[in-house]
Amino acid sequence: METMYHRFLCIPFLLILGLAQGQSKGLQTVTTFRTGLKPIDVTAIRTGLQPIATFHTGQKPIDVTAIRTGLQPIATFHTGLQPVDVTAIRTGLQPIATFQTGVQRVSTFHGEPASTLQGSGSTVIKKIMVSSMNQPVSKNEGIVEVPPPSGGTHVITEEMNWHGGRNGHKMKKLGKKKHHKNRHGGKNHHKMKKIGKHHGGGRKFGKKHRHHK
């Protein structure tokens, strides 16, 4: 019995070791989350068409299927009686998912080693954030809170506050660049003051300006 128990404890380490070998070949990543007494397995096959993730929360399974060849994989989380939908556009570089479980945080993205959490009793998943480097997650921003299922797992899903536009800044439609009242940069981009002899004189820095003869 003790031998079987030790073998069971070695399974997560074998998964991590297999991940390290799989990353060198670019084949697959395996992440295992343990919630209470039930395992939560996430398996993503890099070379195939679709990675499949299965989350066991309480008594209900949560299945995530993403087709890599398309533009947007859709993940549906069924928690309690309400579904929580997460849509991520895969045209960016790295979609990032952050799982905060209790006090520890588990972050998974393409290229990161797999991790294993073991918890006693019920595990509380605080946040699930999915974002992309180049594309927004969804047009709707906010927090969706659902009632915990019978297993005692509470899930709060929060989407990233995406700032689109050039250089990641949120930009408004204010016409051309040089007409932006707060923009700084380059010739004719600054808000020029009418000072100097070409603009009929005037004051500059509190001193009277005189024309040169």
UniProtKB/Swiss-Prot annotation:
Compartments in which it is found: Secreted
Bias kind Basic residues: ranges: 166-213
Region 4 X 22 AA approximate tandem repeats, annotated ranges: 27-104
Any one GO cellular component localisation term in the record: extracellular region
Keyword Transport applies: no
Chain segments carrying region Disordered: 162-213
Statement: the UniProt record of this protein carries the keyword Zinc: no
Domain of life of the source: Eukaryota
Official protein name in the record: Skin granule protein
Species assigned in the record: Xenopus laevis (African clawed frog)
Gene: sgp
